[in-house]
Amino acid sequence: MAGSGLFFKWANNKHAKSVCKPSSLQINSLEKVKPGIIPLFFNQKMEAKEPEKKTPSMEAKATSLSPNKASAS
């Protein structure tokens, strides 16, 4: 049983290192950016900041509705 336990630990260690260690192709793909092409992760960061700009403000809606409420009452 002691021998099989050591083999199990060795197999798990080998697998864990291969999962955590990115390949050289993955690393190079992040470093080499062609001119005019923006990496995907950069676009995702920009989109996360933009929704506040695209949605109309609630204050503008409230001010446009307030004259109607004043004339109705």
UniProtKB/Swiss-Prot annotation:
Extent of Polar residues compositional bias: 63-73
Source superkingdom: Eukaryota
Residue ranges of the region described as Disordered: 48-73
Extra information: Completely overlaps RNR2.
Name under which the protein is recorded: Putative uncharacterized protein YJL026C-A
Gene source species: Saccharomyces cerevisiae (strain ATCC 204508 / S288c) (Baker's yeast)
Source species taxonomy: Eukaryota, Fungi, Dikarya, Ascomycota, Saccharomycotina
